[in-house]
Regions:
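Basic amphipathic alpha-helical segments that dock to polyanions
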Residues: 52-56
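Short helix-capping/hinge SLiMs at alpha-helix to coil transitions
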Residues: 25-29, 74-75
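A short alpha-helical element within helix-turn-helix/winged-helix DNA-binding domains
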Residues: 35-41
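Conserved segment of winged-helix/HTH DNA-binding domains
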Residues: 76-101
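Beta-hairpin "wing" of winged helix-turn-helix
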Residues: 58-73
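Short alpha-helical segments that sit at the start of domains
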Residues: 2-20
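C-terminal regulatory/oligomerization modules of transcriptional regulators
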Residues: 1-5, 99, 103-156
Length: 156
């Protein structure tokens, strides 16, 4: 028999959460409801509230119920991409093994075990790199991109 073709959905929680945190960081003096944040992320307010709840539990963000003024709980240069990843994904690995291979096939049963060590190495390296990237680094890069875009528009 053949395995059915499945469309694998990848998680965008990390990039969506970084988006939320950058919005909060650069709009500290403005009102930011979950609806306005959701509009920017192009998702629904319920999803934004779920992400924000995870950020609060991880002590990366604070907010008061009924007030649309969320804030970072510490400076952006003290929040790493790994902190954000762990807040929204927990211990979920970046790469996943296919556990639905044919157990009667020598390759099917052994390829996953062969990959596991490599996946663990990749996870470790990715987490080490993520721990060196701060939210402030991302904000700075965002502002650089905006500056370049504005300069290009002025040339045209």
């Amino acid at each position: 028999y053949y395995k059915e073709f499945l469309i694998m959905k990848y998680s965008t929680k990390l990039s969506d959460t970084v988006h939320v945190m950058v919005l909060i960081a650069i709009n500290q003096e403005k009102s930011l409801s979950s609806a306005s944040i959701a509009e920017s992320v192009h998702t629904n307010p319920g999803f934004v509230r779920q992400l924000m709840l995870k950020l609060k539990k991880a002590e990366l963000m604070t907010s008061v119920a009924g007030h649309a003024r969320p804030s970072l709980s510490k400076p952006a240069d003290q929040i790493t991409l790994l902190d954000i990843y762990k807040a929204v994904e927990g211990d979920k690995p970046l790469l996943h093994l296919d556990t639905h291979t044919n157990p009667d096939c020598g390759v099917g049963i052994n390829i996953q075990l062969s990959l596991q060590g490599f996946y663990n190495e990749i996870q470790k390296a990715a987490e080490e790199k993520m721990n060196t990237i701060t939210l402030q680094d991302i904000i700075d890069t965002y502002y650089q991109r905006i500056s370049i875009e504005n300069n290009l528009q002025n040339i045209i």
